[in-house]
Amino acid sequence: MKVKNKYLIGLDGGTQSTKVIIFDLEGHVVCQGKAQLKPMYMPRPGVAEHPDDDLWDSIVAASRKALGRFTEDPASIIGMGLCTIRCCRACLKADGHLASPVLNWMDLRLASPYPFDDPQVRYVTTTSGYITHRFTGEFRDTAANYEGMWPIDKDTWQWSGDQKVLETFNVPRKNLLDLVNPGSILGYVTDDASEQTGIPAGIPVVATANDKAVEALGAGLLPGSIGLVSLGTYIGGMVYGERNIKDAQFFFTNMASIPNRYLYESGGIRQGMWTVSWFRDLFGKELADAVCAEGTSPEEVLNQEAWHV
């Protein structure tokens, strides 16, 4: 029987939670699932690690919630897009599993090249590189998620061919994943990943970009006199650009969701909207349970109270 309607999956792996959303081909949300990440391991200033295999575990939980709410034939899902948080570091063993906890973008160790002090480490990559492997078994990643201490050439969107650059960043080419541009197929969902997540095996996993670039595209940040203020865990502003500006003083150049296009991004506020979550949690689980039982949320209650301030 021919499948009439077709659907896509969007995966958004953030700093605080993971969301998996199923859309129809016109962009309407059909259903979704969300899973909170565990509190980060932050034993001292400058250290911020995602505990255990939390990024993947949250994807499994969010995916199962979304697919559990999907009432159509799973065979009607024809592909998925993968987007994760940027500026993180994942160190993988030869089999693609984590050699150590993922360093979150708030970890100050990311300001320095990877020291290669763990003999288990075979690949050094981003969160999207790691999650791509978990879904597809491939050692590939989107070029547009390599912001920070990486030997990437932002003009070509490939690894630098300059040996001195590779030495500066202390990552030999053999320890880096192969890069593809946003919109390219990274691989296909394996039977193992399908069994864990409920996402149909064999559908293509498509590269997107870093989370801020995906947000910019989704918000309609296109050429013209338009700016975007991104209200995430990290708060920042950005505008569209068409060339890699290397000597900017008051912003940095981030790779966009469109190949060979850029975003000029301001400095920002670290732990910006995370502070909202922190403030909410000060009121305790009892409040959250009580308001959720009434069909609302702690955030909505706080919004209502804020009107009286």
Model-derived regions: residue spans:
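Short beta-alpha connecting loops at secondary-structure transitions
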Residues: 42-47, 100-103, 256-266
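Glycine-rich phosphate-binding loops at beta-strand->alpha-helix junctions
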Residues: 16-17, 181-189, 209, 234-235
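N-terminal glycine/serine-rich phosphate-binding loop of ATP-dependent small-molecule kinases
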Residues: 1-98, 178, 194-195, 199-204
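Gly-rich Lys/Arg/Thr-decorated short loops/hinges at beta-loop-alpha junctions or inter-strand turns
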Residues: 38-47, 141-148, 169-176
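Short beta-strand-loop/turn "lid" adjacent to the catalytic site in phosphate-handling enzymes
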Residues: 68-105, 132-155, 177-182, 186
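A short alpha-helix-loop-beta-strand transition element characteristic
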Residues: 73-75, 82, 118-125, 173
